[in-house]
Regions:
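FNR/FR-type flavoprotein reductase catalytic core
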Residues: 3, 90-251
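Short, charged beta-turn/beta-strand-edge "cap" motif at the junction between a beta-strand
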Residues: 63-66, 107-113, 286
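Non-heme iron-sulfur electron-transfer modules
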Residues: 263-288
Length: 288
């Protein structure tokens, strides 16, 4: 049987994957000072697409440029989709100025996916750092939609400050509605903060899961993922059941330009989701 690394979910691409399809902005929601979510619907010219948790799109701001962004919405809501984006460059700055009713071009969905089916019958540990919660959010939706198929589900989430926490209201709803363990930590906080303080890896040692029967999925800054994997391995989580999302300088989305190549893999085509045993020799290596 093919694994998540050997095949991508067949994406409902338009006949020309290099041609952006028009989407209309339905809603703009400010998440934090530098992060926002766009909710988009397909225009009347096409029907949109379905996607698997962990896949990404290339978002095109007409007249400005294109940037790869993971899909952050519930797969069950497709073709309505959401993208949560941090303002970090020219394209995302222009994207932040878009308003309800404006058009955005989308190519995709591209890439491999989180192992939500492979994790059935296991404990699932989800470790997110900062904006890394956004690519993991579709997996959380899918896990909760079929909660009875999994054992423990644990979300460990780290941000810089309490003000940087994404989807704060949603996290509280999930904690109360589902059998879901959620632990949040921040790097620094005022004395009024009642949660954990410290890097997210400090949560792993006390998190309630069975390492011998756990699937772990991790997304965040590369350095954070490296240390997270180290702590998971100390607990006994197998490298082949530890999944990371690597999104490095993707341009075409279909493996043609080679811009996202590092080592023998292309992040846009072979990833962005990889098992750690495959990715371990490449972590920290610059693109070729």
């Amino acid at each position: 049987m093919a694994t998540v690394l050997e095949q991508s979910v067949p994406a409902e691409l338009n006949p020309d994957p290099m041609l952006p399809m028009p989407y209309r902005i339905q809603r703009v929601r400010q998440e934090t000072d530098d992060t926002f979510t766009l909710e988009l619907i397909p225009t009347d010219s096409h029907d949109g697409f379905s996607f698997a948790p962990g896949q990404f799109n290339m978002l095109y701001v007409f007249g400005v440029g294109e940037v790869p962004i993971s899909i952050s919405s519930d797969p069950a809501d497709a073709p309505r989709i959401q993208h949560t984006t941090r303002v970090v460059g020219t394209v995302t700055k222009a994207m932040r100025l878009l308003q309800r009713g404006d058009l955005l071009g989308i190519r995709g969905p591209f890439g491999t996916h989180w192992p939500v089916e492979e994790a059935i019958g296991h404990d699932v540990v989800i470790v997110a750092g900062g904006i890394g919660l956004a690519p993991l959010r579709p997996a959380l939706y899918r896990l909760m939609a079929q909660r009875e198929k999994y054992r423990k589900i644990v979300l460990l989430y780290g941000t810089r400050t309490p003000e940087d926490i994404l989807y704060r209201r949603e996290l509280e709803q999930w904690r109360g509605k589902f059998d879901l363990e959620i632990q949040v930590t921040v790097d620094r906080a005022a004395s009024t903060w009642r949660g954990y303080v410290g890097v997210v890896t400090t949560l792993i040692t006390r998190a309630p899961f069975d390492p011998s029967n756990t699937v772990a999925i991790v997304c965040g800054p590369e350095e954070m993922m490296r240390f997270t994997v180290m702590e998971l391995q100390k607990r006994g989580v197998a490298a082949q059941r530890t999944y990371l999302s690597m999104e490095r300088n993707m341009k075409c989305g279909i493996g043609l330009c080679g811009h996202c190549q590092y080592g023998p893999v292309l992040a846009c085509k072979d990833g962005p989701v990889f098992t750690y045993d495959r990715l371990a020799p490449l972590l920290g290596r610059a693109e070729v």
